[in-house]
Amino acid sequence: MNPLKKIFQFYINSSIHVALAATALTWVTAEELQLESKSNVLGLVFCSTISAYNFIKYFGLAQIHHRNYTSQLKWIIWLSIVATAFSIWLCFSLAQSALFVMLVSGIICFLYAIPIGFRHQFLRGRNLRAVSGLKIFIIGLVWTLITVGLPLMDNLTSFGTTEFLYGLQRFVFILVLMLPFDIRDTAYDELKLATIPQILGLFWTKIAGAVGIGFVVWVSFSLQMQRLPVLTTNLLLLAALLYSNPRRSFNFSAFWVEALPMVWFVLLGLSQI
């Protein structure tokens, strides 16, 4: 395989790309809400995203194939161990309220990946990922907690109408950002997962996503945020959503769609110059 292709594959599969996206959104939060952009919080978001995503993606695989790891998987495991160690170390620098946000997010991620042993009426021995209709909302909640709740709590900022609306905006943005992934996976997801494209169909999923994008832009305008970065990013997201179908390549969503938070970050950074 081409060395550059190997590096790119590792970059995507090791969750470095998604970690950069989460870190970019955290920085966007700090800038738009005029919070102190702390390096420890940004570092924690980056490292913990790598840890959480790789744990969710590879925990079962590592258990089954622990004697036959590929070279890439070995490197991903070592990267995840280092990222986890840095995450734990950086947690000690957080305010107590921010540490609580990390704890709640960590518990949700754990329950998302690991089936619960007891047969609770709701989980019935499953993980949260397997609960019908819940997957995308769990992802939206955790991303909102990490990219909005964490910087707010570490700056000891009280919650008001502005913070609530901003958090709701981020939640909706993440939901729409996940739709191209759900559309891509329509052919593979079991019907019992009840993803939004399975429930609404392709056309109405795109309509719902467009409405969500309209809400995101409206909130930014209402809160008098920088207009060009959010408008450009969400127009690109709308284009990606309209272009999405189950036949699109893996890299379309895993790289290009996932890069949109970084576009927001770059545009907002340029607007500050």
Name each model-derived stretch.
Residues 37-50, 69-74:
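Loop-to-helix transition at the N-terminal end of transmembrane alpha-helices
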Residues 132, 136-180, 186:
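Functional transmembrane core segments of multi-pass inner-membrane proteins
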Residues 21-44, 86-101, 145-168, 218-227, ...:
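Helix-coil boundary and interhelical linker segments in multi-pass alpha-helical membrane proteins
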Residues 45-67, 176-197:
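Acidic (Asp/Glu-rich) catalytic motifs at the cytosolic membrane interface
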Residues 19-24, 80-86, 138-150, 206-217, ...:
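Core segments of transmembrane alpha-helices
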